[in-house]
């Protein structure tokens, strides 16, 4: 009896919650992480993908405000940015900035570094998972769920509400309308997937000029290698393809503002036209306006 009472009095150990980096990796690789091979494969993948560095970064920014967290990541990466066309960027007033997406999260860091001196009020559309790493990102990132199957009415309402507040406050909003990394097309040219028309619709609704931006950065080697044979392996490279850009060079080209009333009334058509301009004209002739 005494032994039984003693056993009942001993608190049951509670497992510590999984680290957010582990959670995000396993969510992106559900089949692999539930397979019998995962305990064997995981240490190898984590070593390859720089898991320790990703975890350290996540722990560092978790308690920070959004601006401090973004500056921390910017300082951590110390990306070298060559900027052209900065004179085209309006210094005040509402803007919707749209750009291609060649390398991953580092594209946003490079754009931030390039534009923050002129537009310190810049805020980004970003995958909603970023806020799970750092809740303070509300200051600098608007959470967006790019995967249609994961969208909910509440998440969409939050995105739209924050968008309205940002543009009514005359801030600059940066969007990567592809929502996914670029791939090589049939001709071997790095090309974004079809751009979602959201950014154009928002610009038209709030009468905000659109500033096109072209981003050129280092090749995302592991992302494209894994993309050939496994979508899950490809998707868990997100932290690796951010942190391995440390000290690397990006080129940012800024085009002339596009008045929203000059666009095709069909947002999808207008979005496709701007995408073509950003990818095929802007990096070679930044002074040539979109027509």
Language model regions located:
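Generic beta-strand structural signal
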Residues: 95, 120-123, 140, 163, ...
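Short, conserved catalytic or adaptor-binding loops enriched in Gly and charged residues
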Residues: 71-75, 133, 242-245
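Short, charged beta->alpha transition segments
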Residues: 80-86, 128-130, 159-166
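Catalytic core of membrane glycerolipid acyltransferases/transacylases, capturing the structured
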Residues: 40, 48-52, 96-152
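Short, flexible loop segments at the rims of nucleotide/cofactor-binding pockets, characterized by
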Residues: 59, 72-78, 101, 149-154, ...
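Membrane-anchoring hydrophobic helices of lipid-metabolizing enzymes
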Residues: 2-98, 108-110, 117-121, 289-291
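Non-catalytic C-terminal accessory region of glycerolipid acyltransferases
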Residues: 2-9, 13, 21, 156-291
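Residue-level detector of flexible, active-site-proximal loop/helix-junction positions
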Residues: 88, 129-131, 148, 217, ...
